[in-house]
Amino acid sequence: MPDLPFTFTLPTPELIPSHYDNHIQRRLSALKGQFLDEKAYAEMLEREDTLLYEVYEIKRPQAAGELLTGISVVHPGKVGGEFFMTKGHFHAVLETAEVYLCLKGEGFMVMENPEGECVVERLAPGKVLYVPPRWAHRSVCTSRQEDLVTFFIYPGNSGHDYGTIEQQGFRKLVMDSPAGIVIVDNPRWNKK
């Protein structure tokens, strides 16, 4: 990877980078234990291991001073009443932040820190979201037919800690209801 300035484009309507180094596809099976309705999860997985989201990474060295960038695409859909979402993560270097720019679609960023504070922010095109150090974060697509597409940037040495979220999930869930989209407490969170 050359140490030179570079550019890339995000051609519309897909907004997939003109250049990327890694394409990650996360399917339903990768989020085992993360959806509230375990029966709906099992039934859906039995039918098909549905593609929930994709990440297009533009790699840089995993070193202080570098910035890693990319595009996250969360597809529309639900497991039971819960919208499709990313796995969510803390950074392995907890004291590192991340910035997201929503390019397309609608959704939420669910965030929490180890001290128990929770914040859920709405995402819509043009909205910039700053995730401070120490905050786990997960993107949730609430669009009915449109992908939630975000551009992200974070320090090269931050790494990812998916394991903590896999063990206990997030404290808040984004659910569909007859009254519309609701943010609810995760009833299983304290049981883990």
Region locations from a protein language model:
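N-terminal capping/interface segment
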Residues: 1-15
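Active-site region of the double-stranded beta-helix
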Residues: 17-121, 140-192
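Short beta->alpha connector loops
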Residues: 114, 134-135
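Hydrophobic beta-strand signal
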Residues: 130, 136-138
